[in-house]
Amino acid sequence: MAEGNVFACHSTEGWRSKLQEAIDTKRLVAVDFTATWCGPCRVIGPVFVELSKKFPEIFFLKVDVDELRDVAQEWDVEAMPTFIFIKDGKAVDKVVGAKKDDLERKVAALAAAATTTEATLPAQA
């Protein structure tokens, strides 16, 4: 299920499938670890959706920590919201808390870095 360009993962299998898809396509992943009872999560959620529209080259995923506890534990999520940025299956950065400016800056910087890196890679023969 998607809201904007954000895909909500409702199963561990779905999570792993989406993460693998991002790895296979060499895309940066932005994950919103959230909870339905978390007030700040509800405030920052629409910002995450807007960022997904602004940066379609990034894979945006949403994980409810109560629904997918194993995934939250695997990524050491201790507070909500936590935004983790993943490249090639490894965490490269994160933002903890509903910090709109920090989140927007981080996504923009990582998107620019990903674009620059891809542009400077030699072409595959």
Curated annotation (Swiss-Prot):
GO cellular component: cytoplasm
Signal peptide: none
Gene (UniProt): SB09
SUPFAM superfamilies named in the record: Thioredoxin-like (SSF52833)
PROSITE patterns, A to Z: THIOREDOXIN_2 (PS51352)
Predominant place of localization: cytoplasm
Site feature: Contributes to redox potential value: 39-40
Domain of life, source organism: Eukaryota
Protein name (database record): Thioredoxin H-type
Record site: Deprotonates C-terminal active site Cys: 32
Classification via InterPro entries: Thioredoxin-like_sf (IPR036249), Thioredoxin_domain (IPR013766), Thioredoxin_H-type-like (IPR050620)
CDD domains: TRX_family
Subcellular localization(s) per the UniProt record: Cytoplasm
Protein family per UniProt: Belongs to the thioredoxin family. Plant H-type subfamily.
Function of the molecule: Participates in various redox reactions through the reversible oxidation of the active center dithiol to a disulfide. The H form is known to activate a number of cytosolic enzymes.
Residues at the active site: 38, 41
Keywords: Cytoplasm, Disulfide bond, Electron transport, Redox-active center, Transport
Disulfide cysteine pairs (residue numbers): 38-41
Domain Thioredoxin: 2-112
